[in-house]
A protein has these predicted regions:
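Acidic catalytic loop of the alpha/beta-hydrolase fold
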Residues: 171-175, 201-202
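Primarily recognizes the serine-hydrolase "nucleophile elbow" in alpha/beta-hydrolase
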Residues: 86-163
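Short beta-strand/loop motif that positions the catalytic acidic residue
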Residues: 160-162, 167-169, 173
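Catalytic active-site module of serine/aspartate enzymes centered on a nucleophile-bearing elbow/loop
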Residues: 207-233
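The conserved beta1-alpha1 loop
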Residues: 33-37, 141, 169
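Short alpha-helix in the alpha/beta-hydrolase fold that links the catalytic acid
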Residues: 47, 151-154, 163, 176-185
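Catalytic histidine neighborhood in serine/cysteine hydrolases
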Residues: 187-205
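Serine-hydrolase catalytic machinery in alpha/beta-hydrolase-like enzymes
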Residues: 5-102, 129, 203-211
């Protein structure tokens, strides 16, 4: 069972977090903060599956709820509020275990917000919006654009990330295909793209001949573990 924490976001509100660490496995020395997507909080099957699976592979995994999810609201807050929440969580985790390599990331929206706080600010950005210092960023299903709106790219900040970035993407993801991500990654400083052949935005494969979802997810977890291991070497 994960340890449960309460993290104060400001003087009036705290959000819940969970820490997954499997004492039976060899510790990698790395922590991954994994943020949820827009439609489901940290207790969704996807989030719990990945938190448990990655902790079984030697990572210390921290999940949390963005404020809107903690409050039971369906619509996400605007990006500045999401970023501020993620920054508070990152600062708390770093203060708690400063000796560990710190990675941030998430599913879909959670991964996008992680990339945004890891990116260097543009001239004129507000104070307090500088890049958080992390060992790397993991995006599981990066939402490059809204479905059916490929002209509305969410990529301007990505070249400003100096830390290594791993993007795991379904080849049939309506939020961004391998072809669409290619030119974006070419402009990034240290980016790795892992494609799930036939995969959708949830990294699942819908065809009848596809492997079971847990087998696909296990392969993704192995990819994340191996990538983190190479980064911290």
């Amino acid at each position: 069972m994960p340890d449960r924490l309460s993290l104060a976001l400001d003087d009036t509100f705290a959000t819940s977090a969970r820490v997954y660490q499997d004492p039976s496995t060899e510790d990698s020395g790395a922590t991954l903060i994994l943020a949820h997507g827009a439609g489901a909080g940290q207790t969704s099957p996807f989030m719990v599956s990945f938190a448990e699976g990655l902790s079984a592979r030697g990572l210390r995994v921290v999940t949390f709820n963005f404020a809107y999810s903690e409050q039971g609201r369906r619509a996400p807050d605007r990006a500045p509020k999401l970023e501020a929440c993620y920054r508070v969580v990152t600062e708390s985790v770093r203060a708690d275990t400063p000796e560990r390599a710190l990675f941030i990331g998430g599913k879909s929206m959670g991964g996008r917000i992680a990339t945004q706080i890891a990116a260097a600010p543009e001239p004129g950005d507000a104070a307090g919006t500088g890049a958080v210092s992390v060992s790397g960023v993991v995006a599981l299903g990066y939402p490059l654009h809204p479905p059916g709106r490929p002209e509305k790219l969410r990529d301007a900040h990505l070249p400003r990330i100096s830390a290594p970035v791993l993007i795991v993407q379904g080849a049939r993801d309506p939020f961004g295909t391998e072809t669409e991500l290619g030119p974006v990654l070419a402009r990034m400083q240290q980016a790795t793209l892992h494609i799930i052949d036939g995969g959708d935005h949830s990294l699942s494969i819908r065809r009848k001949s596809a492997p079971p979802k847990d087998v696909i997810y296990s392969g993704v977890m192995d990819t994340v573990r191996d990538w983190v291991g190479r980064v911290v070497e």
